[in-house]
Regions:
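Cytosol/nucleoplasm-facing, intrinsically disordered, low-complexity tails
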Residues: 1-56, 158-164, 180-183, 187, ...
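C-terminal cap/substrate-recognition subdomain and adjoining C-terminal extension
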Residues: 1-27, 33, 47-48, 115-254
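A short, well-structured juxtamembrane/interface segment
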Residues: 43-52, 113-133, 286-325, 374-382
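Active-site neighborhood of HAD-like aspartate-dependent phosphohydrolases
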Residues: 49-90
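A metal-dependent, Asp-based hydrolase signature
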Residues: 73-133
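A transmembrane-helix-recognition feature enriched in membrane-embedded lipid enzymes
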Residues: 78-98, 105, 249-305, 361-364
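Catalytic core of membrane glycerolipid acyltransferases/transacylases, capturing the structured
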Residues: 152-169, 281, 299, 318-375, ...
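A cross-family acyltransferase "interaction/gating" segment
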Residues: 268, 358, 389, 400-473, ...
Length: 517
């Protein structure tokens, strides 16, 4: 009789150890299906890359293993590194404690604004083709916490439901520990009575205890590691949803090797960005441009308006009333007007929307804030045009991808003709733009790149008074024409999205920066 309590205790201890260590290879959990009948899934190895989903499977729900059946890379390091850096963990980045001490809203913002770009770049085209063959798809993330991947899977991939690991929280902050599967419910009530098919990789299935959700599937298709190595990168034009807006400072995929290179570059980058800033702020353009080139900055001008003697050569384009020229450009970084000023070899004024006072103090050219009141803004811009040239970015905010936001028609009512300027830039390590509270560091981050590059293309003047079919075009129509011409020169796609749309998507606000920041 005394052996029965011991047997029960030993059996309970054995079950605890088994849950912690996982099942040995080639063994699987035996759990209840959604219908309540215990089942084993049929495992189909070597799922062909040209696997076509027939009509019978379309009516079933696909359980998609995100790491095994969608992403090409098996390394999860870059995604945790992105959360650690973009959520401002500061010194905790060095020890890679990604979630420790972070608030939920900060991690959610990184997952919404930064991670989708890197997930899209890691998607395998072959895996996405299989996902598109199903009307209902449930995403299963075995290793990446749900909060990191849910927004991407629902907003960009259109998945119905996401099941993933949860990170434990204490008093509203993460403690960096993952909850066990037994500590939560799957929440599959919506799939009650629906046949399910699983899709993942062989490596994930046999390397550890597989997720209980796959025991609810009738069949599980597994891709071999050899097949997955042949997966191709998903082209941008095949993204499930266009990637127009994204945030974050890192312009590269933070693999362990790339992250180590960045950390080794940082000490030199800090000194380099200070040097470059001082050069552009304090020295004449004729001196600062060669010095900048010597430090690794690449600048290229197309259709330069500067003649051989260093004077602006607009020739017959000069306006008879001696007013300044209004340059209209797309918006890539805070330095757009500065580069135009450098290429013109003279000081210009720039209209800005919401920039920090630090950026205004460090600007080598005069900046004037727009009030978003058309009458007041027109009143401010008129005297500036009487004194000299003026640069305005009608988009009102930057866009990193090959898209143009809607152009504000304010500039159309000021002058009879405008001078479009098409801008393109490259950053190989850090982005010089942000929607976060550290916008005052934008130009510092841009100058921290080893080889930042800018291309400034001056275009033919365009009239603001346009008549088509006997009707004078409205101001917004003229603004759309200017947008289309710049987009054609750059190969960018014009959109109707605005500054407000960008900040609501990425930051949850309307993008107004406090001048005291």
């Amino acid at each position: 009789m005394a052996s029965k309590p011991f047997s029960k205790s030993f059996f309970a201890f054995y079950q605890f150890i088994q849950r912690r260590l996982g099942n040995p290879p080639c063994q699987h959990h035996h759990r209840q299906s959604t219908s309540g009948v215990p089942t084993y899934p049929v495992i189909i190895h070597g799922c062909p890359l040209a696997f076509q989903v027939d009509d019978h499977l379309q009516n079933q729900a696909l359980v998609l293993d995100i790491e095994g059946g969608l992403l090409r890379s098996s390394s999860l390091f870059p995604y945790f590194m992105l959360v650690a850096i973009e959520a401002e963990v500061q010194s905790r980045v060095m020890v890679m404690v990604c979630f420790l001490g972070l608030k939920e809203e900060k991690v959610a913002r990184v997952a919404r604004a930064t991670l989708p770009k890197h997930f899209l770049e890691d998607i395998g085209r072959e895996g996405l083709e299989i996902v598109r063959g199903f009307k209902r798809v449930v995403g299963l993330s075995r290793m990446i916490p749900r909060i990191m991947v849910e927004d991407f899977l629902k907003e960009y991939m259109g998945l119905e439901m996401v099941v993933g690991r949860e990170v434990k929280m204490v008093r509203g902050r993460y403690v960096g520990l993952l909850e066990m599967e037994s500590e939560r419910k799957l929440g599959l009530e919506k799939l009650e009575g629906t046949e399910m098919v699983g899709f993942g990789s062989c490596t994930g299935y046999f390397s550890h205890d597989y997720h209980q959700l796959f025991t609810c599937c009738k069949e599980v298709y597994l891709v071999t590691p050899e097949q997955k190595k042949q997966w191709s990168t998903l082209p941008r034009d095949q993204y499930p949803r266009p990637l127009i807006f994204h945030d974050g400072r890192l312009a590269f995929r933070p693999t362990p090797q790339a992250t180590l290179a960045m950390l080794m570059w940082l000490p030199l980058a800090v000194h380099l960005t200070v040097l470059r800033t001082l050069v552009f702020v304090n020295l004449p353009y004729s001196i600062s441009l060669p010095i900048g080139s010597a430090t690794g900055i690449t600048t290229r001008v197309i259709n330069s308006p500067i003649s051989g003697n260093g004077c602006t050569n607009h020739g017959a384009l000069a306006q008879p009333n001696q007013r300044g020229h209004l340059y209209v450009c797309n918006h890539r970084t805070l330095l757009d007007p500065v580069y135009i000023s450098v290429m013109l070899n003279k000081k210009v004024s720039a209209m800005t929307y919401s920039v920090s006072c630090i950026s205004e103090l460090l600007s080598p050219i005069r900046t004037i804030r727009l009030t978003r009141n058309s009458d007041e803004d027109r009143r401010r811009m008129e005297p500036l045009l009487q004194k000299g040239d003026l640069v305005i970015c009608p988009e009102g905010t930057t866009c990193r991808e090959p898209y143009l936001l809607r152009f504000s028609p304010l500039f159309v009512k000021l002058v009879d003709e405008v001078y479009p300027v098409a801008l393109m830039n490259w950053s190989n390590m850090f982005y010089g733009t942000s929607t976060g509270r550290s916008k005052y560091l934008d130009h510092f981050y841009y100058f921290m790149n080893p080889h930042p590059a800018y291309v400034v293309q001056f275009m033919e003047r365009m009239p603001t008074h346009v008549v088509t079919n006997g009707r004078r075009c409205e101001s917004y129509e003229v603004a759309n024409m200017v947008q289309s011409e710049i987009g054609r020169a750059l190969g960018f796609e014009p959109t109707k999205l605005t500054r407000k749309d960008k900040y609501l998507i990425l930051a949850g606000n309307e993008g107004v920066v406090d001048a005291k920041q």
